[in-house]
Amino acid sequence: MLATPTLSNFDKPSLPSSEGGDPALAARLQPLYSRFLTDLDLQPEYRRHESEKLMEEVLKFAKSTGVPHDLNSHSYQSLMVGYTYADNCLPYHDIEVKVYVAIYTWLATICDDAEALGIIDDVQLFEQRFILGEEQPTVLLRAFADQLKLTYKLYHPLVANLILCSSLNLLTSTSLVARKGIKEKGDHPSKGGNYFAWYIRERDGVGEAYSWFTFPKRQFPNLDIPIEAIEDMTRFIAYLNDVLSFYKESLAGETHNYINHTAAYEGVDSDAALHKTAQDTIDCARRIESVLAGKGEYEKAWRLHASGYLQMHVQRGRYRLIEVGVGDAPDVHEVIKKI
C-alpha cells in the first residue's frame, strides 16, 4: 500500500549542526583556502545572478510536486540550494532547463540525507521500483522519479542515460554508506583499498549528472565535444565541494567524507589529504580548459558553470567560509530560524 503523504522528517525545522566556529581551525585553513582560490583562477570572473522569474517558476514547480517545503524547513533550504545552483551555474540556459536542475537538486539533496531523515528503507529500493515500473511509496520519491523521466525531454538520449545512471548511483551509495559495515571501513581501512574512497565519492557526488547538466540538447546538440572532459568535470565537482565543505564538516564532527577516508587509506593526516584534494581540483580545472579550448559555446558554458559553482560555495552561508575569511554571510533566502 502506498504511504499517505504526511509532514515528513525532511520538512521539519532545520537547525544548525554546530553553534560556534573554531577560530584555531579557521586560522589553520585560511592560508590553504586563500591559495586554493587564487590558484584555481577560474575565468571569466563570476557575476552574481538572482533571477526573480526563475524563483517564481521554481516555487511554482515545487508546489506542483506535493513535496512539503515550508519556509522554516530542511526541505526549503534544499530547494534554495537548487535555485542558487541553477541560476548561478547555468546563467544563460533556457529557463526550463534551470527549473529542471533546481528541482532535481532539491529532491536529490533530500534523498542524499536519507539516513539523517530516517528514510533509508524507502530510498534503497527506489531503483528496483523504478526499473520494474512500480509506483514509489512516498511523495518525495514519486517526485524524484518524475524528475528523472523529464531528463529525456531536455537532454540527448545518451546524455539522459548517463544522467539517469549517475542519479541511481547516488541513491545506491546513499544506502550503502548508511550500512554499519561500510562506515567501519573509514575507521578501519583494509590495506590496498585506497580507491574505495573515490569509488563511493564518485557515486554519492553525482558529479557526472551535474557535468552533463551543462549541455542540454537544444543549446548543445553535439555530445562528442565535451565528452573527453566529463571525467575531470565529475571529479572537479566532487573535489571542489570536498575542499570547501571541509571546515563546516569538521565543525560538525563529520569524518565520513572523501578527505578523511582518503587520509585513512593513504596513512596521512586530514590536512595532507585536504592539500592533495585541493591540488587535484586545480589539475582537473586545467585539463578541462585544455579539452574545451576553442570550442565556442561549449567552453563558455562550462567556464560559467565552474565559476558559478565555486561562488555558490563561497556565497552561501551554509559552508561557513566567512569564518575562514573567504566567504559571505547567509543571504536572505537561506536563513533558517531556530524555533
UniProtKB/Swiss-Prot annotation:
Catalytic reactions on record: (2E,6E)-farnesyl diphosphate + H2O = (-)-longiborneol + diphosphate
Required co-factors: Mg(2+); Mn(2+)
Residue positions binding Mg(2+) 1: D112
Tagged with keyword Metal-binding: yes
E.C. no: 4.2.3.-
InterPro entries: Isoprenoid_synthase_dom_sf, Trichodiene_synth
Pathway note: Mycotoxin biosynthesis
Biased composition (Polar residues): 1-17
EC category name: lyase
Biotechnology: Longiborneol synthase CLM1 is a potential target to reduce Fusarium head blight disease. 3D-structure modeling based on known 3D-structure of losely related enzymes has been used for screening of hypothetical inhibitors of CLM1 catalytic activity.
Stretches for region Disordered: 1-21
Induction line: Expressed under trichothecene-inducing conditions.
Motif (NDXXSXXXE magnesium-binding motif): 241-249
One function term, GO molecular function aspect: carbon-oxygen lyase activity, acting on phosphates
Binding site for Mg(2+) 2: N241, S245, E249
Pfam families membership: TRI5
Keywords: Lyase, Magnesium, Metal-binding, Virulence
Consequences of knocking out this gene: Leads to complete loss of culmorin production. Does not affect the trichothecene biosynthetic pathway since 15-acetyldeoxynivalenol (15ADON) is still produced. Keeps the ability to convert exogenously added longiborneol to culmorin.
Annotated function: Terpene cyclase involved in the biosynthesis of culmorin, a tricyclic sesquiterpene diol reported to have antifungal activity and some phytotoxicity to wheat coleoptile tissue, contributing to Fusarium head blight disease. The terpene cyclase CLM1 is responsible for the cyclization of farnesyl diphosphate into the intermediate longiborneol.
Family (UniProt): Belongs to the trichodiene synthase family.
Protein known as: Longiborneol synthase CLM1
